[in-house]
Swiss-Prot record:
Gene that this sequence comes from: aaeB
Transmembrane segments: 11-31, 41-61, 65-87, 91-110, 125-145, 150-170, 369-389, 406-426, 430-450, 455-474, 481-501
Role summary: Forms an efflux pump with AaeA. Could function as a metabolic relief valve, allowing to eliminate certain compounds when they accumulate to high levels in the cell.
Signal peptide extent: none
GO biological process: carboxylic acid transport
InterPro entries: PHBA_efflux_AaeB/fusaric-R, PHBA_efflux_pump_AaeB
Annotated membrane topology: Multi-pass membrane protein
Lineage: Bacteria, Pseudomonadati, Pseudomonadota, Gammaproteobacteria, Enterobacterales
Full protein name: p-hydroxybenzoic acid efflux pump subunit AaeB
Alphabetic keyword roster: Cell inner membrane, Cell membrane, Membrane, Transmembrane, Transmembrane helix, Transport
Length: 648
């Protein structure tokens, strides 16, 4: 294994090669603004490195590149459409561009974090193209095509540099995580069966949920890394669902042990409690549990434990297939065929997304009006920086710190860019080698700092490349540099002011929406078999978002896990069907989820709890077993007891 310093040096060399190669090819092909291709190579390679805090995986660079291509094409098409329709009304055209940027930011806040970059980019790409062509609108098609071509060139250079200098495959990290998955699940089961240390159980649950979420992200990166891994990706998709199922089963055993400490027979308690330290020991323990289950016959055992042993056996089989990447066998094919496609649900951050879109639209519109009113030369650059910062920063976990990173980068880029613009670049005009060496030194230093997640490092690299006039041919008017540099700084500052002024107070509202969605998912498990679907991955995504918004709220976290456990228990229960009562329960749950106003939601929750209780009483009169009705009673009790969390 390479030393971490060697890995950091390797990525810095990759970043340098990508930027220098994009510039050389840009000058060779006679592109008008090779700066765009260099900036693209820098952002595609350095962006994932800053997010990961180290050298990014090869698949992450390719994924980022595809998102940038999609966003650029969408933004270019929007710019062409606006220019064709509103060429005679430039003010209205610019304001509609600002509205488009706001809409794209709003939509990017509703999609998954991994895909938000494409929508955010398409918003300010349209603004860049329209602003650049205001003086010569007849060249907008040429400018849009050139921008798309330079973006593709920069991405190709970033991918080529990563491929030439030993790409970092995500497969090794996937094998490490998958290899230790059974051990982690068994340790969680031990803590749940013991049940004395609730904090240790919470830590184990939290760690496994984050590990499963990370594994799902690595699967997307592995799929783009090479065409050798489609079988591994199929297995990883099933492993993700199996991991979440085992976590839920362990949580169910924990709740069962707290209610009935004698639910598990003594031989199972003794075997589970024995310590395990390595994945090999965990595999041997699983085989012992299977033998004990076969000898015991499954009589008087909690269904959760039987399901856990069965799921762990499937997980171990798929984990071996991921490591070897061999052809999918008959038993694996049966497991993969049984794994239903996960259901997609809408984002719970609608209010948060609306605020983000409002921030971008308001900031860019005010910047555009000020620019058109004042005639300031740097106004267009300032407005574009406002759009860039507000579009990208609001989708990060900490928008304020992301905006500060942009601001610090633009401030550092001012003296660094001045040195290059006034001294270094004019002195290297007669030698292409010296030009590449001078820019390579800057990108190498920034590449080392980006991997340390140094505040302002990524902003410095992007801002410096943006204000340097890397055009063909190159000219060095000092007024242009000063306007561009000052416009960048003021744009980042105004974007930070807008983020601080337009407060986002939707955290509590989003938390209540997430809890209501988890409750709705538990109630939805009462539907017929054909309409249930695989809700488990979607429910855990809601839980992961809940953990991100409320990292220290253990009570809310436990309540969410309880609702997920009840959803699984109800989904696998064999309750008699009462179509009329189930329709009433489903209608009340829908009103609880989508109802406007606290009074309506309060009434819907009362109808829901009453309907669940009536349904349970009706089943008792029909002679249903008490064990089958237990999750139904628990769900009604949880919804009534925690109505304050659901309604606020």
């Amino acid at each position: 294994m390479l030393h971490p310093r060697v890995i950091r040096l390797r990525f810095a060399c990759k970043l340098t090669l990508a930027i220098v190669l994009s510039l050389l090819l840009g000058f060779y092909f006679g592109l008008q603004t090779p700066r765009w291709s260099a900036l693209t190579a820098a952002l595609v390679a350095a962006g994932p490195a800053f997010a990961a805090g180290g050298e990014p995986f090869a698949g992450a660079i390719r994924y980022r590149g595809w998102l940038r291509i999609i966003g650029t094409v969408l933004g270019s098409l929007c710019a062409l459409l606006l220019m064709m329709l509103l060429i005679r009304a430039p003010l209205l055209m610019i304001l509609l561009c600002c509205l488009w940027a706001g809409v794209c930011t709003w939509l990017s806040s509703l999609v998954r974090m991994e895909n938000a970059y494409a929508l955010g980019l398409s918003g300010y790409t349209a603004l860049i193209i329209v602003v650049s062509c205001l003086g010569e609108p007849q060249f907008i098609l040429q400018l849009a095509l050139e921008r798309c071509g330079e973006i593709v060139l920069g991405i190709a250079c970033a991918v080529l540099a990563d491929t030439l200098l030993a790409p970092r495959s995500v497969k090794g990290e996937v094998d490490r995580v998958v290899g230790g998955m059974l051990l982690g699940q068994l340790c969680l089961l031990q803590r749940c069966v013991d049940g004395r240390d609730s904090d240790a159980v919470d830590r184990s649950w939290h760690g496994l949920i984050r590990e499963s979420h990370t594994l799902e992200g690595m699967r997307a990166s592995l799929a783009l890394e090479s065409s050798r891994w489609p079988r591994a990706c199929r297995r990883l998709a099933a492993l993700h669902t199996l991991s979440l199922t085992l976590i839920t089963r362990a949580c169910e055993i924990f709740l069962t042990q707290r209610q009935t400490p004698t639910a598990l027979p003594a031989p199972f308690l003794t075997l589970i409690a024995a310590p395990v330290k390595t994945p090999a020991e965990a595999y041997q323990r699983l085989k012992q549990l299977r033998r004990l289950l076969a000898a015991h016959g499954g009589h008087q055992l909690p269904p959760a434990l039987i399901g856990w042993i069965d799921g762990a056996s499937q997980l171990q089989l798929l984990a071996k297939g991921v490591a070897s990447n061999v052809r999918i066998g008959r038993h694996e094919a049966a497991i993969l065929a049984h794994d239903a496609a996960p259901r997609q649900i809408y984002s719970a951050q609608g209010h948060h997304a609306l605020i983000n879109g409002l921030r971008t639209w308001l900031a860019t519109s005010l910047g555009a009006l000020f620019w058109l009113w004042s005639g300031w030369n740097a106004g267009s650059g300032c407005m574009i920086m406002i759009a860039v910062v507000t579009s990208l920063a609001v989708r990060t976990p900490n928008p304020r710190m992301a905006a500060i990173d942009f601001l610090m980068g633009s401030l550092v880029a001012l003296p660094v860019g001045a040195l290059y613009y006034t001294v270094i670049l004019p002195a290297t005009q007669q030698s292409l080698v010296l030009l590449c060496l001078s820019l390579g030194a800057l990108t190498f230093i920034c590449g080392m700092e980006v991997q340390k997640r140094r505040l302002g490092s990524l902003g410095t690299l992007a801002s410096t490349l943006n204000i340097l006039v890397l055009s063909n041919p190159m000219r060095f008017p000092i007024e242009s540099f000063v306007d561009s540099a000052i416009g960048q700084v003021i744009g980042c500052l105004l974007a930070l002011v807008v983020l601080l002024a337009v407060r986002d107070r939707s955290r509590a509202r989003t938390g209540r929406t997430l809890m209501r969605r988890l409750a709705f998912g538990a109630v939805a498990a009462l539907r017929g078999e054909g309409t249930r679907g695989n809700l488990l991955p979607a429910l855990y995504r809601q839980l992961f978002l809940l953990l991100t918004l409320f990292p220290d709220d253990i009570g809310r976290y436990r309540l969410a896990l309880t609702l997920i456990v009840l959803q699984q228990r109800l989904a696998h229960s064999a309750l008699p069907c009462d179509a009329e009562r189930l329709r009433a329960i489903d209608a009340a749950a829908t009103r609880l989820l989508t109802g406007r106003g606290a009074a309506r939601r309060r009434g819907a929750l009362l109808q829901l709890t009453t309907g669940l209780s009536d349904y349970a009483d009706a089943l008792v009169r029909q002679g249903a077993a008490g064990a089958a009705l237990q999750p139904l009673h628990q769900l009604a009790d949880v919804l009534h007891r925690y109505r304050g969390v659901l309604l606020g």
